[in-house]
Each structure stands twice: as C-alpha cells, then as structure tokens.
Amino acid sequence: MGAESLIKSNDEDIGELNDIVGFHIRLAHGAVYRHFSETFADLDLTQKQVSVLWLVDDRPGIAQIELGRRLRMDRATTMTIVNRLQDRGFLRRERSATDGRKQALFLTPAGNKALDKAKHAIREHEDWLKDRFTPEEIDKLVEMLTRIHE
C-alpha cells in the first residue's frame, strides 16, 4: 500500500479501493454534481447550458463551432444545447457578419436574466466547494485537475 493511506473512509473500510485515485475522483465528482443539481434545481439548467450561456455572454457573436471547441463539446452536443436554449428564448442565432456559413450566438434579455440567476447559484455552489479548502489548496487542486483534463 506504500505510505499508509492518508484518506480513510469514515463510513466503512473500502479496502484497496482507497488507494485508487480514479475512485476518489469519481466520488468527488458525484458529490459536486449532486450539490450542483440541488443548487440549480429551480433554474432548470444543466452545467453545460450554463457554460454555454456564460461563454456567449463573455463573447457575444461567438460562432457556434468556436463555442463547442472552447467548451470541448462535439458538434452534435453543441447544436442540441444551443437549440434547447434558443427554444427557451435564451439565445438567438444570426449569420456571422464575417462568414455567412457560421452562426453567431447572442443572449436574449431572457438569457441574460437566466444567466444572472445561474451566476448567483454558481457563487453559492462555489462557496460550498471552496469552504473545504484553503486558497492555496484551491490553486493546487485546480492545477492538478487541469493536468488530468488537458
């Protein structure tokens, strides 16, 4: 087991699973996702939908293809999310002024309102998460997680 495992389950002995990094990442992901879902239940928005609204707000007129690339989503997923947000009146599409083949995305007033509510919920969710760590640990955690997903 190497250096005695520093992380012990309070509920029960999980044996060698305790030494599997991926197992702990899965447990952490589950806890974060559950809290996110509870925090966002009244907004009826998914994590990906909020990410799309936020990026479109940060970059008005962003091309749908560029949006998907930046959020690391395939074309089909991007189109499905954009379609749903447009159907709900949160986004509008326009032909790109620079390239008529591309769709430029913009938030509608309803999209701005939904994003404002989502940002409030995200602050609540982030506070819940960050309360478990020091500022230095947060920086290190983000750096380590980035190594995994990049």
What is the role of each PLM region?
Residues 14-19, 26, 30-77:
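N-terminal helix-turn-helix DNA-binding core of bacterial DNA-binding proteins
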Residues 23, 38, 54-55, 113, ...:
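Surface-exposed charged/polar residues within alpha-helices that form helix-capping/stabilizing sites
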Residues 4, 33, 61, 83-143:
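Charged, amphipathic alpha-helical coiled-coil/dimerization segments
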Residues 1-17, 135-150:
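C-terminal regulatory/oligomerization modules of transcriptional regulators
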Residues 80:
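DNA-binding alpha-helical recognition surfaces that contact promoter or target DNA
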